[in-house]
C-alpha cells in the first residue's frame, strides 16, 4: 500500500537576506538540508515521509478531520490523508508508545519526547471532541545561527547587531511570544554566540534547546510515574543547576513555580541568564508574569520587584501575516506605582 500522501519539496523565492557589515552582496547556495533522523519504530511509518521532510516544523492530526503540516508559513492541509476514528486513535496510542508512555481512557492526555528530539502530544476522544488529536513538534534538522535567522527575515542587520551585543554584555534576557513564533529558535541562536569558555546549563520541561556550543549541559524535567513517584520538576532542576557552577543559566520556558527559582538565580549574580515566556504581546507580559508568580506563592509586588531586578531586556517575537517569524520589539521591565509594567525600547 502506498503512503497516504506524497511529500514534495516546496520551492520558492528565499526571504530577503540580511546584509551584515562586510558581507558580500551574494552568498553561495546552501547545501540541501539532511533528512530528519527519526526513531526506527514501525508506528511512525504512516507519517515517516512527512516527518522526515526537513522543511516541516509541526504536524497535526485533527481526529478524522485531516492531517496538517507547517513548513514555516502556517499549517496547511495534507491532501489525500483519510483515516477513520478507530485508526486515528490507534495511531495516537502507537505514537505515544514510541516515547515510552501509555495513552488510554484513564490517561487521555499525554506528552512525550522521542529519541532525536521530536515532541508528541496526544488527546483521546471524548476529551478531543472530533477524535484523537495529535500534535508533533519537530526539531530543526540544521541548527540556524543568528546569521541564518537574519537571512530568513527574522530581523534586520541593526537588530542582529543589537542581539549580539546583548549576549556580549551578559544581559539577562526574557524572550517572549506566542506558540510557534520562534522563541526557542532565537534563544538557541543567541546562546550560540556565548564565548566557548563559558558553561551553559539549560533546563527544560521537554528538551528542545539545541545549541552550537562546546560546554552545554542539558537538564530535562521528568514526569512522575503512575504511582506519583519519581517526578523531577523544573523548580527542582533550577535549584540543582545552581550547584553545577553555571556561567549562564537558561530556563527553556517558564510555565509555573520555576519562575521563582529563575528570578532568584538571576538576582544572585548569575548574569547572562535567559528564559522564555508565552505572551501574545509585550504589554501582556506583566499579567503573565504575575500569574506565574502566583503559582509560586509570590504576590504581585514581589513579582514586580524580582522581575525588574532580574531581567534586563525583553525580546518579543511574533509571526506576521505572511507566516514569517520576526523580532517585533524590545522592552525592559519597570515599576509603575509598585506594580510591574514594561517600557518599550526604541
Question: What would you call each of these model-derived segments?
Answer:
Residues 211, 241-316, 328-335:
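Conserved P-loop NTPase nucleotide-binding/switch module
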Residues 70, 76-169:
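P-loop NTP-binding catalytic core
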